[in-house]
């Protein structure tokens, strides 16, 4: 029996690939099985000191993602003997990665793209896994797609179950069990009852926080002693009737040396403008994201303490300033440009390759693997979903051969 903990980019693809290969697979998900449109109800809460965007439900963070699909950390992973070239090609074809048709590039996004190019910045459409034929361009990607037009880990879990896998939802895995240095099962809690499930192999794909807590309780004291979370702010301002709030979000991309920019609506920008006549349809805003240093840790109760370095702050400031130039070039009133608070979107690096896992994502406990953003050695500074999918495909192929 192979037990997979979590149903996001890592767990979902692993479950699909292994179940289709005829392997006996049981998937455990801490959250419920939901309709995608209800995903906004399942964002996690952390301490007031950290604003971190994660979810606990079927599909994990993928169900509220923008379905952005970019390759990241290729060279860094190669240093650990991890070549994802073939895996990338497989998953890109599987989920349909492509740049959106012009029919799904709205006025605000086009203004962003035009401004970036006029300023000589490295500007392109964002690769995504969205089906234009189904997408209604509502702007609600981050709340859960109301028409299931974008890929999420839920899709792969459904495939796995159809192929014979067992799915147990609302089941919190608390510990991995081992004997003589080898996996023998897991403990989990469902309906307030502790259960034991025997397993020959266990793969933790519960996200950087969830997997870390399980590792800690399973004897890995070093897990969670460092963390990145791809910090971001949104910078925006007033441009009458741009209607950007109903566009497909993050459909454009500007790649800087130390940051990336992508058009992303934030209602918090409107609150910064002292004019009651300004509404959401009058806001154009840009997400500024950087690759932060892995300074911080995960506490034993699952809270996150993040330490911002001078470089973290410097690069975010550089990106925010560039976003201001792009917005002004795009037609935004410069007197209205403001920023949101600092937040984090992609926690990871809590069980990195080379420290907690080896190049096959296996821990010191035989047949215990980790496959999610936890294993990334450094912050990608850009959406990590495609990289996690590729790591998952590579691990699935490795396990099929055993």
Positions of predicted regions on the chain:
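Rossmann-like flavin
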Residues: 63-64, 68-136
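An active-site-proximal "capping" alpha-helix that borders the catalytic cofactor pocket
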Residues: 386-401
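Helical element adjacent to the flavin cofactor pocket in flavoenzyme catalytic cores
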Residues: 136-195, 200
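Helix-loop-beta segment of a Rossmann-like dinucleotide-binding subdomain
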Residues: 94-99, 123-163, 302-308
